[in-house]
């Protein structure tokens, strides 16, 4: 498969779980725990997909979603929001800002992998 996925998640256990399971599926995985680190990774790499948590220590993942989708160089990168926020309003805002899918925690790794494959 060999697609490069960026995981933006501040919980180390979730990040490691995603790295492991996505790696087993043949994806290359880069992961960061903050928006600051995410900006650097996005600017210096080509990603096939971004998995984005909304609640990060240095801001909202929604801001990053808006920036990625508003930049001509990165607007085509699919974004799947992966968050504990399950209110309908949060989902609608995520989709309005350009997210391609929205998955709430706790999540099924198998289902997430199928969603990733559908979006890529």
Outline where the language-model segments fall.
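N-terminal/domain-start alpha-helical segments
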Residues: 1-120
